[in-house]
A protein has these predicted regions:
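Secretory targeting signatures
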Residues: 1-28
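Structural recognition of the beta-strand scaffold that forms the well-ordered cores
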Residues: 34-39, 67-72, 122-126, 167-171, ...
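Short beta-alpha junction loops
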Residues: 41, 72-77, 129-130, 173-175, ...
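Terminal, contiguous helix-loop blocks that mediate binding/assembly
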Residues: 28-30, 132, 137-393
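Active-site groove signature of glycoside hydrolases
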Residues: 113-133, 137
Length: 393
């Protein structure tokens, strides 16, 4: 009888252990995406911040395999860290006043999210006013903002801490679809999403973006980037918006090849400035986009592809023709998604996805350029072309 009991107990134990092993092996699947939003509404965009967060919550489906984490700082209000789910916005942390224009704040946010909300893929959305090479996220309480170099510094720190590279850095901010911005971020992200143009206050269409991500949690970063570009432009087209809107998705792996072609193109123009200065002036004028941004200054950016295309058409120089064509091909390779609408008809409807800084003269040039995009200035010869052109004209 004792032996029978032992056998029975052994059988029960074996059964329980087998059941337990099944439970342990059934680990929950890793979250597919973490969508982190660095939402700096500490300025006149304050009303749009809560609106966009609500759109995220509305768009997320119940049980979506997605983390949506938002750091929002509003005008004259403390900052909060939120976890957004279907029809719910939960406060994770109350942070008091924070400086959204500090790279330290951005680094803290990204590191916190990487630690607490790990996923297969990550998107960082930088939300606020944008100024192209000058940066993004102007904090009116501190007076500071994030330059592209600051963003690179923060993301480098986060990557070194957690060995994770952000898949997509998106800018829900004006004018950030620039060569200089992409160059500065080439080592810290795989894809940049940004606009050559101004972005309306309503920003990205977060409800439909979250609906898509909820329904397609295993989407790859490239496909997701294309979807964001398409949805953004469709959103304003359906609104019958009066805004010229444009958005690009850029493959950061292609930046070094583009920079090499840009250097060769710029060097040849600089070395032949006396014969090229006239066509440079014509091409610059035809491709310029001038933006007057109140206290944020005046921006003189040109569509780089269009600039090279006009140089190619006007130059009576086979070398210039070849170098311009090479640059155009590299830009085409970088910009893997682009869309725009031009309801006003007062701008050239053809946009190619990337601008570059080219003020009309030395008086309009800002020396801040050399500080805000340090890597680009040091490692390319574009600035040398600008200075050579200014001296010659």
């Amino acid at each position: 009888m004792k032996g029978a009991k032992i056998v029975f107990i052994a059988l029960v134990a074996a059964f329980l252990l087998s059941e337990f092993s099944v439970v342990v092996s059934a680990k929950p699947s890793k979250t597919s995406w973490t969508f982190m939003v660095y939402l700096d509404a500490d300025n006149n965009l304050d009303p749009y911040g809560p609106l966009n967060v609500q759109q995220m919550s509305t768009g997320l489906m119940p049980g979506a395999n997605v983390n949506v984490i938002v750091l929002m700082d509003r005008l004259d209000q403390p900052a909060y860290l939120y976890k957004v789910t279907h029809d719910s916005v939960e406060v994770i942390l109350s942070l008091g006043e924070v400086d959204m224009g500090s790279s330290k704040t951005l680094a803290w946010f990204v590191k916190y999210v990487l630690k607490k909300y790990s996923a297969e893929h990550y998107l960082l959305d930088l939300w606020d006013h944008g100024g192209g090479y000058r940066g993004v996220c102007w904090d009116e309480s501190s007076g500071n903002h994030l330059s592209p170099h600051d963003i690179e510094t923060a993301l480098t720190e986060a990557e070194q801490n957690y060995q994770v590279k952000i898949d997509i850095v998106g800018f829900d901010a004006c004018l950030m679809g620039m060569v200089e911005v992409c160059y500065e971020l080439k080592d810290v992200t795989n894809i940049v999403i940004g606009s050559e143009m101004l972005i309306p206050g309503y920003g990205w269409p977060y409800e439909s973006i979250m609906q898509y991500l909820s329904a397609n949690p295993n989407v790859d970063p490239c496909t997701f980037s294309k979807e964001i570009v398409e949805q953004y432009v469709s959103y304003y087209a359906n609104m019958k918006s009066a805004y010229f809107v444009q958005l690009s998705a850029i493959d950061e792996a292609k930046v070094p090849e583009m920079a090499e072609s840009l250097n060769a193109f710029a060097d040849h123009l600089s070395q032949n400035i006396d014969t090229c200065k006239g066509i440079i002036a014509d091409a610059r004028g035809a491709s310029q986009q001038k933006f007057i941004m109140g206290t944020m200054g005046v921006y003189y950016y040109i569509d780089l592809y269009k600039f090279a295309e006009i140089i190619k058409e006007k130059a009576e120089d086979e070398v210039v023709d070849m170098l311009a064509l090479n640059l155009m091909k590299e830009i085409d390779a970088m910009v893997f998604a682009e869309d725009h609408i031009n309801p006003q008809g007062n701008l050239d409807a053809k946009q190619f996805g990337l601008t570059i800084n080219f003020p009309p003269n030395l008086q309009a040039y800002s020396s801040g350029y050399e500080m805000y995009v340090q890597c680009f200035v040091k490692e390319t010869t574009w600035l040398n072309l600008l200075m050579t052109y200014y001296k010659a004209t």
